[in-house]
């Protein structure tokens, strides 16, 4: 009979109890409240096939609810141990462990053969079933022997085990052993935390793992007769990895994040995925999808049935696809095999990939459409059916190389070979054409058999060979044409070898012969050829001379630097130039211009054409000039100007058509003029000077007499004959005559001055005067005769008178004769004067004409090629750091020199320290910062391979350090045996032995003062000399300027006259020459350094050759004597003398100058001595002589006896200051028997361990709780106030945090706004709304998506971060964008059209703008060309035809060795590069070099490179000796660095007596000390122990520095005046009472703060001072050995002494040992840790500072606790309020429980109303029921359908109760066997 139970309220115990409605009224002795018992019972009823089929309630026992049978329970009645427990069923217990055996299903996770009911740990548990056990509170165990061991765990099913917290195990012998795990199914196991296992034998072992599925159940072992019930490990579903998932029968996921879905799928790699029946992902990150698909390598992907990925990172896509390991290089690109592949099939089952978009990136897949578009048309390679090399596209073996063609090979990096048998071997080389070959770097060979390969072992670089059979075999050579050879470095050959067609063309051949006189020969093929630096352009052109140029067919330039322009032109002389067809320039420096011109003389010039060979200008004489057709200048220095002009003798000049000057120094000027004798001059048309020295001036004038002059047209000067009139002088044949006319054509000489000398010409005026006097005399004679006749009679009378008259008359006649003679003489004199004047004028005219001729010659030679004149003069300007710019004409030599002698052999110089860099301004010369020299001299200081030597000063060499009788000052105390010692150390020895060293006077300042005066006088003299020299220079400059002005005036006048004379010629030549001027100016020269880009300078521009020193550096600061330059093949190499001299050398902090060696903040060695700068002088050999330095070993030996007795003494660290005592124990030293020191704020006395212990103990008592005093005096605090915290700060913070919790906050999330308001009832209202401005990841509206990347419209435009994509649409209505350099605006079509139109207008002509904006141009500028490039090229070709030999002339560069036989000038063409290099590696980094030591100055000869006398280097290496920032290191010898002086095991000799404390001492001083103290040793030393504090001795009598026992007896000894020791962890310093007082004072304060308890610590009684003596002021302290407590006063003069090396003393009650700062710090640290928070320790005195303890804002414990109390009070108020609120919650909860009770009763009634329908095979059956329970009622209807064979049935039902919602039930039942 079914029993009915109900739940009633037991008012006596205040609990609900379950009781039978029909049993006797028998209550349990005790019961426990179960608030939700109704729900639990209804759940239990639902599990039963028949509701409440059971027994009465008499069988249960215990304090809770126990329900079981009373008589048939073999296992015993149900039993509960707690009031809240429920045990239902026989043997169900919540206390004792009793049980029985169950059938074992071999679950390895739950294989117990016995189930026991265990004692309940806490209440609230449910166990239902025989042997069901719940071991933790709130657990549930339902089923026979079900066990729950974790809190809130659930175990449902026979033998189910739930051992993890909140774990769930459902199913027979299922196990959920980990926290939060779930196991559902027969023998299912969930052992991983948070794992889930569902299904037979399903196992989830990993953290958060999931296993769903069953194994091979049919083959599982039977259990108790049940087939397949045992745990089946085979094909079991398993998830063993962290976060792994196995879903499906036999699925396995063994690694972290592995996923296996499908029957027997396997995922055995980390983060691997296997989906599909039998799918296997064996390695990490593998992905497998498909039946039997498999990926066996890491990262593999297999998708599709049977797909296999058998290589790492490979993908197999599609049914039976296979992805294997990739091998071999990639086709075409030759990339190595990748690490993975993508396979969409297998061999024989390949697949096609369809609907592939065109690829864009290099690694994108390409489509057939792209291949069709990329297919190259009209390209094919025919191997005639015979595959050759490169058939497999493997001919390109170099990196990034290209090989196209049969047998083509490209072995060089980035090389290209195109054509059959083409070979590109060099890096970057190009070979195009059959059998073409390039072997050098950057070579280009284009054409059949074109090659850049020279003889064996000779290969070119960057050469170009273009044409059939063409070869370019020199570096940077160019060969273009058929059978052309450019065999020289930097050569250019353009042309060919075949003139057959021209030779066979009669007309052309005849033309060639007419012009050249030669014959073209068919069948002969001389090749176009160019040598080093040469250029040959034209068929059969030859440029074999170095730096030569040959332009034109069959032209030849065979001389070095020669130039030949024109067909068959020839320039065979060095520097020769031939311009024009058949022009011949065969002499060195010769110039021939014009057809058939010839210049064969050295430096000769021939300008003029002739129709036939020999008819052109001919200059065969050296320095001769022939200008004009047929002009002949055959004499040296001769000049023939004009058609057919001849100058055949030395210095002869013929100017004018047909003019002939055949005599030496003769001049013929004018058409047909002849001067055929030496010094003859003929000026004028047809003028002839046919005698030596004759001058014919005037048209057709003629001189036939030697030294005669014919002046005037048609004048004839013949030989003089006869005697002179009156004077009867014979004519002079040697002096010649002057003729101003000829017979019948005499000329009047007018405007003649009256003659005065006998040889002067007389004038008509003078003759008239003579004639007048003669007439007067004749008249007188006539009168006298008449008188005689008329007066005969008077004859006798008058005879005497007459005689007198006759005598007078005779006298008068004689006088008249004499006067007439004088007049004639005067006339002759005047005539002679006139002759001289005429001669002078003729000579002046001759000179003027000669000047005109010479100037015309010079001007024409210059103007023939204006570039050769103007540009030669323009040249280049060179500038240095200082000095005027230096100008060099083209061809001039620029000397780039240093100050060293040019004869200096190369072995004495080196360029390894020099490097040049090209800069924007020119060439910068720099020195390596780490330079190497054989020798460096700075004034009197020399640094070489032997070491450092200062003249008349100290030296440091391999042999040792010689102080040069100078002091070694500022020497640090020696430490090691070989260290130098200073006077201070020696003085200390002497003081210890009561001796004194007599001081000596230092006279260095006087010497320095005298030297300064001398330098000042020298400077004054130098300044005076400089001033005088400046005045002289000024005067010289003034004179030079005056001379310059005069010369300028003369030159200008001459130039004006010359321009007037040959202006027409100049005008004609200017237009031609100007066209090439600009080009040649721009060509200039290139300059290169060791590194940097080449620097280009136009002609006339300035090239700066500078150093890094300031340009303003005065010359006195620099010198070029260390610099030398040498010319090399590449240019100018700048070198430094290996033995260099400087005023100063600076390397970092180290300076070497004439005074010596100085290291900043380090030692120095100068003339004044050695200053060690507070550093040690180490490795000093033992001193021997009196002036040798002594080392510390010698000093130690001297003090050995004292040390023997003094070793046990405790000493001050510094005997003078007495502020510190360091005890020498290895692990510290224990000071025993230390009397308790006074503890106060001012105490300096040492304290002992017992005092520390007392303080620590007082702190312990103040803190209380678990505080412990450790043996070292520190404190340990644990769980202060039960807070779980170990320091006061954290404890207070913990209490504060607890008080401030229980706070509810509402915060705003993304796009959310929270508004807080207060309701009328005082409660808080939170209004939540969205923000007006939202922040979202993405917004999608239809086809439009707006996200972080931008705006995208499907199949339309997009605006994203990558830009605007119009999507194939037009962008219309675009406003005009800004067109500027930095504009990013879009532009529209109108703007583009406007631009195109403006370009059209700029080009002009026939330019047309097309509709699409493009431009069409035709016949630009009338050139016939249709594009600007070709048009400019066409114009440029016309300009370049005028380029001449000035390109070759360039500049010459000289160096120091140019002045010797060792070097020669370096020549560079215009546009070429001149390398100005040093010997350092060009790859030297810029931070390794510096130009700051170099300066360049321009001089008259060029640019002079100088170095600063005071130079700076990072390092100087001299023969292995290094001078750098650290100092000087001598290889194998001493060193002096910032760390001190290391003598290198050598003696320091010749050391002056040390004076100051830090001066070095010599052995003489040491010996003197020894002698002075020899008698004193032993007198007082033995008594030292009576006065000194000493270390203890060990059992062997040796000094034990780990212990010092003070001799104060039992009471100890006070250590007074102890300086504050360091209070820190690990400190071994002694601490004094003052420090402890500070600590104690702080502790007192903290103690008061903690519990407001005032602990007064009495002053510790201290004993009186014992026997402590200080022998004299600032002397040693000795502690007496008297018994009783004594103290050591360490106050000292300033009260700042410290006792160091104090070993840890004992800290305990009764301890009187001294403690050190480390112990005090440890105690303070423990106090700090106990207080916690922001507590800090002052390292000076160990005091403790606390801030904001526990976050209370208070700085002491008392206030913090007060704050805490207030918080606790506030917390109490909050708790009280919380209790009131909880009362209301309980009231509401009870009310809800009442409602639950009603609904539970209604639920029970509903369950009871669902009556089981009958079980009839093949039929539908039903049942209707009604029930009443606990005041609630229900009705129910059940429907059953049973199968025809009766083996299963399905049931469904519905019930409606008086409370709650309707209940629905569905179930299925069947028969297993």
Swiss-Prot record:
Might be a good vaccine candidate. The ability of Ata to engender anti-adhesive, bactericidal, opsonophagocytic, and protective antibodies validates its potential use as an antigenic target against multidrug-resistant A.baumannii infections. Residues 606-630 are annotated as: Disordered. It holds the Pfam family ESPR. GO terms for cellular component: cell outer membrane; cell surface. The chain crosses the membrane at residues 1818-1828, 1832-1842, 1851-1857, 1861-1872. One of its GO terms (biological process) is cell adhesion. Important for biofilm formation, binding to various extracellular matrix/basal membrane (ECM/BM) proteins, adhesion to collagen type IV, and for survival in a mouse model of lethal infection. The signal peptide, cleaved at the inner membrane, guides the autotransporter protein to the periplasmic space. Then, insertion of the C-terminal translocator domain in the outer membrane forms a hydrophilic pore for the translocation of the passenger domain to the bacterial cell surface. This is Adhesin Ata autotransporter. It comes from Acinetobacter baumannii (strain ATCC 17978 / DSM 105126 / CIP 53.77 / LMG 1025 / NCDC KC755 / 5377). The lineage of its organism: Bacteria, Pseudomonadati, Pseudomonadota, Gammaproteobacteria, Moraxellales.
């Amino acid at each position: 009979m079914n029993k009915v139970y109900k739940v009633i309220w037991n008012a006596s115990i205040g609990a609900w109890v379950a009781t039978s409605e029909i049993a006797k009224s028998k209550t349990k002795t005790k019961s426990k409240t179960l608030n939700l018992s109704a729900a639990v019972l209804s759940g239990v009823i639902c599990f039963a096939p028949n509701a409440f089929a059971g027994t009465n309630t008499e069988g249960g026992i215990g304090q809770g609810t126990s329900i079981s049978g009373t008589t048939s329970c073999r296992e015993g009645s149900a039993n509960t141990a707690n009031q809240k427990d429920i045990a239902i069923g026989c043997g169900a217990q919540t206390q004792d462990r009793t049980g029985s055996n169950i059938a074992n299903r071999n679950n390895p996770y739950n294989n117990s053969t016995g189930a026991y009911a265990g004692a309940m740990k806490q209440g609230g548990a449910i166990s239902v079933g025989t042997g069901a056990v719940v071991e933790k509170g709130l657990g549930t165990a339902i089923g026979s022997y079900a066990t729950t061991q974790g809190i809130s765990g659930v175990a449902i099913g026979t033998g189910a085990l739930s051992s993890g917290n909140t774990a769930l195990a459902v199913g027979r012998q299922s196990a959920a052993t980990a926290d939060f795990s779930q196991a559902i199914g027969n023998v299912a196991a969930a052992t991983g935390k948070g794992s889930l296992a569902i299904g037979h034998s399903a196992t989830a072992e990993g953290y958060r793992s999931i296993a769903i599925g069953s194994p091979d159940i049919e083959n599982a072992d039977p259990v108790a007769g049940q087939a397949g019930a045992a745990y089946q490990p085979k094909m079991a579903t398993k998830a063993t990895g962290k976060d792994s998932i196995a879903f499906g029968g036999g699925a396995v996921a063994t690694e972290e994040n592995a996923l296996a879905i499908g029957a027997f799928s396997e995922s055995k790699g980390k983060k691997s995925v296997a989906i599909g029946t039998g799918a296997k992902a064996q390695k990490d990150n593998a992905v497998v999808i498909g039946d039997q698909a498999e990926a066996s390598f890491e990262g593999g992907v297999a998708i599709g049935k049977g797909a296999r990925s058998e290589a790492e990172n490979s993908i197999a896509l599609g049914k039976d696809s296979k992805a294997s390991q990739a091998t071999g290089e990639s086709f075409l690109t030759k990339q190595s095999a990748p690490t993975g592949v993508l396979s969409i099939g297998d061999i024989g089952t390949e697949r096609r990939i369809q609907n592939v978009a065109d690829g864009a990136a290099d690694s994108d897949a390409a489509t057939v459409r792209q291949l069709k578009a990329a297919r190259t048309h009209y390209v094919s390679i025919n191997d005639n059916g015979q595959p050759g090399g490169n058939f497999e596209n493997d001919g390109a073996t170099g990196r990034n190389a290209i090989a196209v063609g049969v047998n083509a090979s490209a072995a060089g990096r980035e090389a290209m070979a195109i054509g059959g048998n083409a070979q590109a071997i060099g890096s970057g080389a190009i070979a195009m054409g059959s059998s073409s070959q390039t072997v050098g770097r950057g070579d280009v060979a284009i054409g059949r058999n074109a090659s850049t390969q020279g003889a064996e072992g000779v290969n070119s670089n960057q050469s170009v060979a273009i044409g059939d059979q063409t070869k370019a075999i020199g570096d940077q050579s160019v060969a273009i044409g058929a059978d052309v050879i450019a065999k020289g470095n930097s050569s250019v050959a353009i042309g060919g070898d075949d003139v057959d067609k021209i030779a066979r063309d009669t007309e052309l051949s005849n033309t060639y012969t007419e012009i050249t006189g030669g014959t073209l020969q068919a069948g002969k093929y001389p090749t176009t050829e160019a040598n080093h630096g040469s250029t040959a352009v034209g068929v059969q052109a030859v440029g074999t001379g170095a730096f030569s140029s040959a332009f034109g067919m069959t032209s030849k330039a065979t001389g070095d630097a020669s130039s030949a322009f024109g067909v068959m032109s020839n320039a065979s002389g060095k520097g020769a130039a031939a311009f024009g067809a058949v022009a011949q320039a065969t002499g060195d420096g010769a110039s021939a211009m014009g057809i058939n011109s010839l210049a064969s003389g050295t430096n000769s010039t021939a300008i003029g054409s002739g129709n036939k060979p020999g008819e052109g200008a001919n200059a065969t004489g050296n320095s001769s000039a022939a200008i004009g057709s047929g002009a002949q200048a055959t004499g040296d220095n001769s000049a023939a100007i004009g058609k057919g002009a001849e100058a055949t003798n030395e210095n002869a000049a013929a100017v004018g058509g047909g003019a002939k000057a055949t005599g030496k120094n003769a001049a013929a000027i004018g058409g047909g003029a002849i001067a055929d004798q030496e010094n003859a001059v003929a000026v004028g048309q047809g003028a002839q000077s046919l005698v030596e020295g004759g001058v014919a001036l005037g048209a057709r004038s003629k001189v036939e007499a030697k030294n005669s002059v014919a002046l005037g047209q048609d004048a004839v000067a013949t030989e003089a004959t006869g005697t002179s009139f009156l004077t009867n002088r014979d004519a002079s044949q040697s002096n010649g005559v002057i003729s101003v006319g000829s017979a019948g054509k005499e000329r009047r000489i007018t405007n003649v001055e009256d003659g005065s000398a006998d040889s002067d010409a007389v004038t008509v005026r003078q003759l008239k005067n003579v004639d007048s006097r003669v007439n007067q005399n004749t008249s007188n004679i006539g009168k006298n005769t008449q008188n005689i006749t008329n007066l005969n009679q008077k004859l006798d009378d008058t005879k005497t008178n007459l005689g007198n008259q006759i005598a007078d008359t005779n006298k008068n006649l004689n006088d008249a004769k004499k006067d007439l003679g004088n007049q004639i003489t005067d006339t002759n004199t005047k005539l002679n004067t006139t002759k001289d004047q005429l001669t002078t004028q003729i000579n002046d005219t001759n000179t003027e004409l000669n000047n005109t001729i010479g100037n015309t010659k010079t001007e024409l030679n210059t103007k023939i090629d204006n570039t050769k004149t103007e540009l030669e003069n323009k040249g280049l300007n060179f500038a240095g750091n200082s000095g005027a710019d230096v100008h060099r004409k083209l061809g001039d030599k620029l000397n780039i020199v240093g100050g060293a002698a040019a004869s200096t052999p190369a072995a004495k110089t080196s360029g390894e320290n020099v490097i040049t860099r090209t800069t924007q301004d020119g060439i910068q010369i720099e020195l390596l910062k780490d330079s190497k020299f054989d020798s460096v001299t700075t004034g009197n200081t020399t640094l070489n391979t032997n070491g450092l030597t200062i003249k008349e000063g100290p030296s440091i060499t391999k042999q040792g350090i010689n102080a040069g009788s100078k002091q070694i000052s500022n020497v640090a105390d020696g430490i090691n045996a070989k260290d130098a010692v200073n006077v201070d150390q020696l003085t200390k020895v002497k003081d210890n032995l009561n001796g004194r060293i007599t001081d000596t006077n230092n006279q260095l300042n006087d010497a320095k003062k005298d030297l300064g005066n001398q330098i000042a006088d020298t400077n004054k003299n130098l300044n005076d000399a400089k001033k005088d020299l400046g005045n002289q220079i000024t005067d010289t400059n003034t004179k030079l300027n005056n001379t310059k002005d005069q010369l300028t005036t003369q030159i200008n006048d001459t130039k004006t006259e010359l321009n007037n004379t040959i202006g027409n010629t100049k005008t004609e030549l200017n237009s031609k020459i100007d066209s090439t001027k600009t080009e040649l100016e721009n060509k200039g020269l290139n300059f290169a350094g060791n590194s940097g880009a080449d620097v280009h300078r136009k002609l006339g521009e300035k090239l700066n050759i500078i150093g890094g020193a300031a340009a303003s550096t005065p010359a006195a600061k620099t010198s070029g004597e260390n610099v030398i330059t040498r010319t090399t093949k590449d240019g100018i190499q700048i070198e430094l003398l290996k033995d260099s001299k400087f005023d100063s050398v600076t390397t970092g902090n180290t300076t070497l100058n004439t005074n010596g060696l100085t290291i900043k903040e380090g030692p120095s060695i100068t003339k004044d001595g050695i200053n060690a700068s507070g550093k040690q002088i180490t490795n000093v050999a033992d001193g021997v002589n009196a002036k040798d330095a002594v080392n510390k070993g010698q000093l130690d030996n001297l003090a050995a006896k004292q040390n023997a007795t003094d070793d046990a003494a405790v000493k001050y660290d510094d005997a003078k200051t007495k502020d510190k005592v360091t005890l020498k124990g290895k692990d510290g030293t224990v000071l025993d028997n230390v009397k308790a020191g006074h503890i106060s704020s001012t105490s300096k006395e040492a304290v002992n361990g017992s005092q520390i212990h007392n303080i620590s103990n007082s702190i312990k008592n103040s803190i209380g709780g678990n505080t412990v005093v450790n043996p070292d005096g520190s404190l340990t605090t644990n769980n202060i106030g039960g807070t779980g915290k170990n320091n006061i700060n954290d404890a207070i913070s913990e209490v504060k945090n607890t008080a401030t919790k229980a706070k509810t906050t509402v915060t705003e999330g993304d796009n959310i706004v929270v508004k807080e308001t207060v309701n009328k009832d005082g409660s808080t209202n939170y209004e939540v709304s969205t923000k007006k401005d939202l922040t979202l990841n993405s917004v999608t509206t239809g086809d439009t998506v707006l996200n972080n990347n931008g705006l995208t419209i499907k199949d339309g435009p997009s605006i994203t971060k990558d830009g605007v994509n119009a999507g194939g649409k037009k962008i219309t209505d675009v406003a005009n964008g800004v067109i500027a350099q930095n504009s990013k605006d879009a532009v529209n079509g109108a703007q583009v059209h406007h631009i195109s139109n403006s370009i059209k207008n700029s080009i002009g002509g026939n330019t047309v703008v097309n509709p699409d904006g493009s431009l069409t141009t035709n016949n630009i500028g009338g050139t016939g060309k249709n594009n600007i490039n070709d048009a400019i090229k066409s114009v440029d070709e016309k300009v370049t035809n005028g380029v001449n030999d000035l390109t070759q002339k360039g500049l010459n560069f000289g160096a120091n060795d140019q002045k010797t036989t060792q070097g020669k000038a370096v020549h560079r063409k215009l546009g070429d590069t001149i390398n100005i290099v040093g010997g350092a590696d060009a790859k030297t980094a810029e931070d390794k070099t510096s130009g700051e030591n170099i300066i360049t100055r321009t001089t008259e000869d060029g640019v002079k490179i100088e170095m600063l006398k005071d130079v700076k280097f990072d390092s100087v290496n001299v023969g292995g000796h290094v001078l750098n920032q650290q100092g000087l290191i001598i290889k194998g010898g001493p060193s002096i660095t910032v760390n001190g002086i290391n003598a290198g095991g050598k003696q320091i000799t010749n050391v002056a007596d040390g004076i100051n404390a830090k001066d070095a001492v010599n052995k003489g001083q040491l010996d003197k000390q020894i002698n002075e103290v020899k008698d004193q040793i032993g007198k007082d030393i033995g008594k030292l122990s009576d006065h000194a504090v000493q270390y203890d001795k060990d059992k062997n009598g040796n000094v034990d520095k780990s212990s010092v026992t003070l001799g104060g007896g039992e009471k100890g000894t006070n250590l007074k005046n102890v300086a504050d020791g360091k209070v820190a962890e690990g400190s071994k310093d002694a601490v004094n009472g003052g420090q402890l007082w500070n600590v104690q004072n702080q502790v007192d304060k903290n103690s008061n703060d903690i519990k407001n308890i005032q602990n007064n610590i009495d002053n510790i009684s201290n004993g009186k001072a014992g026997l402590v003596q200080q022998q004299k002021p600032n002397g040693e302290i000795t502690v007496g050995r008297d018994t009783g407590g004594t103290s050591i006063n360490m106050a000292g003069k300033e009260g700042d002494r410290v006792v160091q090396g104090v070993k840890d003393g004992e800290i305990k009650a009764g301890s009187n040992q001294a403690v050190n700062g480390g112990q005090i710090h440890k105690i303070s640290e423990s106090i700090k840790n106990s207080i916690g928070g922001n507590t800090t320790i002052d390292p000076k005195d160990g005091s403790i500072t606390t801030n904001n303890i526990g976050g209370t804002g208070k700085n002491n414990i008392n206030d913090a606790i007060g704050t805490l109390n207030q918080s606790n009070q506030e917390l109490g108020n909050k708790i009280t309020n919380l209790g009131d609120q909880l009362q209301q919650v309980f009231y509401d909860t009870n009310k809800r429980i009442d409602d639950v009770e009603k609904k539970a009763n209604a639920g029970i009634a509903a369950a009871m109303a669902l009556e089981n329908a009958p079980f009839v095979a093949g039929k539908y059956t039903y049942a209707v029921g009604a029930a009443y329970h606990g005041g609630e009622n229900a009705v129910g209807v059940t429907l059953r359908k049973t199968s025809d064979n009766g083996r299963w049935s399905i049931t469904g039902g519905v019930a409606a109760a008086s409370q709650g919602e309707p209940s629905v039930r569905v179930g299925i039942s069947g028969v297993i066997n």
